[in-house]
């Protein structure tokens, strides 16, 4: 009898405990961690999300898919800037009449502020051409002796090869052979050989001034630069040089939803493995796929406009206020480096930390040309860049105010140094009544201080007696500046030489 009663008590107790557990876990048989349960209402930055036992409501699902597509459109904008930028450059050349690799845009009178080029310089004699390896196959580039830093980049602005003083010819001139992607045909001897990952490739050469003039570099291009398909080695097409100096044309990618049309053109042109599956998938998620129509519906058109607007705004935030400490060259100055992390592939800790995507966006929203020679320490050979857009107090430059920059004596630059002013909107040379918004120690006769330093002045009007050292700015327009060091020497790298911050003069 007692035994039966004890069994009955145990059963009742078990049922009560089971009922208690069921109640506390929402009809589950076991205790469920709250961290894996989705509440029926969730407050987020995109609004209130409603669920029924974990299933999103129809309205919530629409909200989430709109947000997902906007995030992807934004990511595509930020990560595909190199691709869109190269396409805009190609189209800019095409509109200037350059459609074949033997046609070279030559800035025989330097690059002034008329064309829209991302932070182009006013200091070297540019020669620019596009290679089409799909049409022409392996292509030969012959460069003359004495060339400055010269580079070939692929259609994603990835490094293919250097030439000239920083290339394997070491400034002695030479013959280069650029092979198409996946090429497995014969490769003749006698060339510096590189294989590109894309059909479209940009050749950009820099010639140095001699006695402040372009003549020597221009003559060198005319007599020594040759670009032709290897298949036409015996009957090379005649070189054509088209002047870009003083011309008005655009080479900058769109900042609105036309951006996606630019990258669609590239995706259709290039081989499928031009970008990796993950990047292809991200781009395909917004409707862009090789060989297929890109026809976004009304909903997606609105999302693409929004994604481009957010991506563009974010790229500008990264450019003007990078949040990584190693963006700044010196602890006590507001000068930023061009290559955050000092790596032309933007790898963190030699790749252990992956790729710094923000640093890559920062660079390509502001600039073009990607080469180790601009990022690595190359004493007396490469080039280094310092960018500044605010005073020591952290105030962005105002084109209606006056500023001063001191360049200390004994500038550690073997070839030359220069300071160029740029437009914060276009990231191109600032357009003023001065055709060249810059000062260059080999071209301009500037007034030195008794200690050998040089004071440069920025403002809408020249300070009295300082006209030779003045760079004009525009009221109600922002600007920033880049200090270039060609052939940088050890004091640049060890920090024993550095420019002042730019200070307001009242």
Language model region names:
Residues 23-506:
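A compositional/structural signature for long, glycine/proline-rich flexible linkers
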């Amino acid at each position: 009898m007692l035994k039966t009663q004890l069994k009955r008590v145990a059963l009742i107790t078990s049922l009560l405990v089971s009922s208690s557990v069921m109640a506390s876990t929402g009809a589950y048989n076991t205790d469920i961690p709250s961290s894996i349960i989705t509440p029926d209402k969730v407050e987020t930055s995109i609004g209130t999300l409603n669920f029924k036992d974990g299933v999103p409501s129809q309205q919530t699902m629409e909200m989430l898919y709109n947000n997902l597509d906007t995030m992807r459109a934004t990511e595509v904008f930020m990560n595909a800037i190199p691709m869109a930028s190269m396409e805009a450059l190609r189209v800019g050349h095409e509109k200037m009449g350059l459609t074949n690799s033997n046609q070279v845009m030559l800035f025989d009178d330097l690059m002034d502020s008329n064309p829209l080029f991302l932070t182009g310089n006013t200091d070297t004699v540019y020669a620019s051409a596009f290679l089409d390896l799909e049409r022409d196959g392996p292509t030969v580039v012959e460069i003359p002796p004495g060339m400055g830093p010269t580079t070939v980049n692929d259609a994603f602005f990835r490094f293919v090869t250097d030439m000239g003083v920083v290339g394997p010819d070491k400034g002695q001139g030479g013959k280069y052979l650029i092979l198409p992607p996946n090429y497995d045909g014969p490769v003749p001897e006698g060339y510096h050989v590189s294989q590109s990952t894309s059909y479209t490739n940009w050749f950009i050469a820099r010639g140095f001034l001699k006695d402040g003039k372009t003549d020597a570099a221009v003559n060198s291009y005319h007599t020594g630069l040759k670009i032709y398909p290897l298949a036409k080695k015996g009957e090379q097409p005649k070189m054509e040089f088209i002047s870009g100096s003083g011309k008005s044309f655009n080479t900058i990618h769109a900042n609105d939803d036309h951006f996606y049309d630019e990258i669609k053109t590239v995706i259709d042109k290039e081989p499928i493995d031009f970008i990796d599956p993950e990047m292809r998938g991200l781009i395909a998620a917004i409707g862009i796929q090789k060989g297929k129509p890109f026809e976004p519906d009304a909903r997606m058109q609105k999302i693409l406009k929004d994604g481009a607007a957010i991506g563009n705004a974010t790229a500008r935030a990264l450019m003007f206020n990078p949040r990584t400490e190693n963006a700044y060259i010196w602890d006590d100055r507001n000068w930023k480096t061009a290559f955050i992390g000092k790596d032309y592939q933007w790898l963190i800790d030699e790749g252990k930390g992956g790729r710094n995507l923000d640093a890559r966006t920062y660079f390509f929203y502001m600039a073009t040309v990607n080469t180790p020679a601009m990022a690595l320490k190359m004493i007396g050979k490469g080039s280094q860049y310092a960018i500044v857009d605010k005073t020591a107090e952290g105030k962005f430059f105002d084109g209606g105010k006056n500023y001063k920059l001191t360049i200390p004596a004994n500038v550690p630059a073997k070839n030359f140094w220069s300071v160029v002013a740029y437009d914060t909107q276009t990231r191109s040379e600032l357009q003023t009544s001065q055709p060249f918004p810059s000062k260059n120690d080999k071209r301009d006769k500037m007034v030195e201080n008794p200690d050998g330093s040089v004071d440069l002045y920025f403002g809408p009007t020249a300070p009295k007696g300082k006209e030779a050292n003045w760079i004009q700015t525009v009221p109600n327009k922002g600007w920033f500046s880049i200090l270039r060091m060609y052939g940088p020497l050890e004091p640049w790298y060890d920090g024993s030489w550095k420019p002042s911050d730019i200070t307001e003069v009242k």
